[in-house]
Design a protein with these regions (language model features):
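Residue-level recognition of tetratricopeptide repeat
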Residues: 55, 89, 93-96, 136, ...
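Helix-start (N-cap) detector for alpha-helical repeat units in TPR-like alpha-solenoids
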Residues: 47, 81-82, 126-128, 164-165, ...
Length: 312
């Protein structure tokens, strides 16, 4: 069900995309780091038992064990580069796989702490993986850390680190910082690199264009999402944003049509009913407006907008 958060500016909805993309993001970093680890194993015949056990756990996808091994070593040797990096990578992997945001941020903080310490080593200057993971970790921290996410993702990108999701995460971070022009540029690069862009990428580009008041461009991406997406939730959100564009530009009939399509295809929705009330109020039909607000209130007695309109 849509709520007020669903229609807020894109920068404040950064976690929507993050949670949906968690599994994909994990796959990207796993491939990159495993290749590097394979090289380490080949050139270091004198590898310690601790490293051997950690690498075994990592390559098996047991990030919890690899994280714990690295923690144990760091408790005794807190500045060892290899274990700092592996703790940072493992904690990041665990963080993005969590359902609970509090658990996610706990692991993300651990990842950032270890990777920042690893950056104190000279070896980190040529290790783009650290900046890549650190940038994504800061992106998960939210809008307040978007400047750091941008900083480290750009360092990784300038080091020619091969990760296809850098432009998309840069787009997210620029949007979170309010730099929607740079956000559009980054998202557009991600779009060009992807023959089949995700719903979230299409919605992200659209929302950045909306924030720039370039509604014609936004509508193109929203319509593409509606036409191509197999996901009903993405389609509902695209229609909702499209209705908002129509309403704000005075195309009330087109906005009303989008709201009713949402209701017909997705069932009753308190937020849609409330927005219909707002639409009718703009048209001067206060009777229909109050009727829609009452429906919204009955469906969701906690709906702040409906309660305010009805003086409840």
């Amino acid at each position: 069900m849509l709520n007020n958060r669903s229609v807020s500016r894109y920068g404040r909805n950064i976690y929507l995309l993050k949670k949906i993309r968690a599994i994909t993001a994990a796959a990207v970093i796993v491939l990159a780091v495993v290749v590097s680890i394979f090289i380490i194993v080949r050139i270091n015949s004198g590898i310690s038992n601790e490293k051997r056990e950690l690498l075994k756990a990592w390559n098996a996808g047991d990030y919890e064990l690899s994280c714990q091994i690295s923690r144990n070593v760091l408790n005794q040797r807190p500045v060892e580069y290899f274990f700092l990096t592996m703790n940072g990578f493992s904690a990041y992997q665990l963080g993005i796989s969590q359902i609970n945001n509090q658990n996610t941020l706990s692991y993300i903080d651990e990842s950032i702490f270890s990777l920042r310490k690893a950056m104190l080593h000279n070896a980190s200057k040529n290790d783009a993986r650290i900046y890549y993971v650190l940038g994504k970790a800061y992106a998960y921290k939210g809008a307040e850390y978007s400047d750091l996410a941008i900083k480290y993702l750009k360092i990784a990108d300038n080091m020619s680190y091969d990760a296809a999701d850098i432009p998309e995460y840069l787009g997210l971070s620029y949007a979170a910082s309010g730099d929607y022009r740079s956000s559009v540029a980054a998202f557009s690069l991600a779009f060009r690199q992807n023959e089949n862009p995700s719903d979230n990428l299409l919605l992200s580009i659209a929302r950045s264009y909306i924030s720039l008041d370039e509604n014609a461009m936004a509508m193109g991406y929203l319509i593409r999402c509606i036409d191509s997406s197999p996901d009903s939730k993405s389609i509902v959100l695209a229609r909702f944003l499209l209705a908002e564009i129509y309403k704000n530009s005075g195309d009330y009939d087109d906005a009303e049509e989008q709201y009713f399509v949402i209701l017909n295809e997705g069932g009753e929705n308190a937020e849609v009913r409330f927005q219909l009330g707002e639409l009718y109020n703009l048209k001067g039909d206060t009777t229909r407006a109050r009727s829609e607000w009452r429906i919204a209130y009955r469906q969701d007695p906690a709906h702040a907008g409906a309660r305010a309109r009805l003086n409840i």
